[in-house]
């Protein structure tokens, strides 16, 4: 079965791997997936990621981050926009996630950025996901 929503598939794989405390998870390579992982790495939700080929198909191996007691850094990761329901927001109406403790990932004209960066740059865009 073909995956029609690569971002949703990636978020589900990260959520499931985090809940069962896997060290890493293999994800399909795409530009938007890589941009989202850059933000997750910058914000400390994942340790790192590497790109590798499996039978000529590019994949990403994301190393998940845990605290000293093996509690996952990602408590919840949810897709906001889906292929059937795109959600957009202006920078003025950008929602806060967990009163500022979580992050919002936005696809804007400036690229894939956090909700805070979107507010600072005064750009709106498609709300991809929330993480906390």
UniProtKB/Swiss-Prot annotation:
Taxonomic classification: Bacteria, Pseudomonadati, Spirochaetota, Spirochaetia, Spirochaetales
Protein's name according to its UniProt entry: Small ribosomal subunit protein uS8
Biological role stated in the UniProt entry: One of the primary rRNA binding proteins, it binds directly to 16S rRNA central domain where it helps coordinate assembly of the platform of the 30S subunit.
SUPFAM superfamilies: Ribosomal protein S8
Cross-referenced HAMAP family: Ribosomal_uS8_B (MF_01302_B)
Keyword line: Ribonucleoprotein, Ribosomal protein, RNA-binding, rRNA-binding
Gene Ontology molecular function: rRNA binding; structural constituent of ribosome
Single GO BP term: translation
Subunit structure of this chain's protein: Part of the 30S ribosomal subunit. Contacts proteins S5 and S12.
PROSITE patterns, per the entry: RIBOSOMAL_S8
InterPro entries for this protein: Ribosomal_uS8 (IPR000630), Ribosomal_uS8_CS (IPR047863), Ribosomal_uS8_sf (IPR035987)
Pfam families on file: Ribosomal_S8
UniProt record similarity statement: Belongs to the universal ribosomal protein uS8 family.
Keyword Protein transport: no
GO CC annotation terms, alphabetical: ribonucleoprotein complex; ribosome
Organism of derivation: Borrelia duttonii (strain Ly)
The keyword RNA-binding is annotated on this UniProt entry: yes
